[in-house]
Amino acid sequence: MDNADKIAMVERYVEAFEKGDVEIIRSMYAQDAVVEDPVGTDAHHGLDAICAFYQGALGAGAKLRLSGPARCAGNAVAFPFHVVMPGMQIDVIDVFEFNDEGKISSMKAYW
């Protein structure tokens, strides 16, 4: 997976959030993926748990806005963005790690 593909995944992720489309987000993740959002909290293991997590975020009205360029290294991409929800904004850096099939195997959010 080259850097352009990783950056395209970031853009697709942000677009899926804007559309409120959990199925697009689901299609980006590996079956055995892990989401830790934020880092240090209980992780979400597997597609069902990950989709439930995203349904909660989308149900709360969360929207994403990139706040800087994505940075790629190895099998990962890190990107800064703002999460905007009614009454609050959070500055976040997400790190996606990809498996050999180009699916997200790990997502860690720092905020």
Model-based region annotation:
Residues 1-27, 31:
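Short, low-complexity N-terminal intrinsically disordered segments enriched in polar/charged residues
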Residues 2-5, 36, 51-111:
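A beta-strand edge to alpha-helix "cap/lid" segment located at domain peripheries
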Residues 9-16, 43, 78-81:
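Generic alpha-helical hydrophobic packing signal
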Residues 21-27, 38, 64-67:
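Short hydrophobic/aromatic-rich motifs at helix boundaries and adjacent loops
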Residues 34-43:
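A short gly/proline-enriched turn/hairpin at secondary-structure junctions
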Residues 42-52:
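Short beta-edge strand/loop motif at the mouth of beta-sheet-based domains
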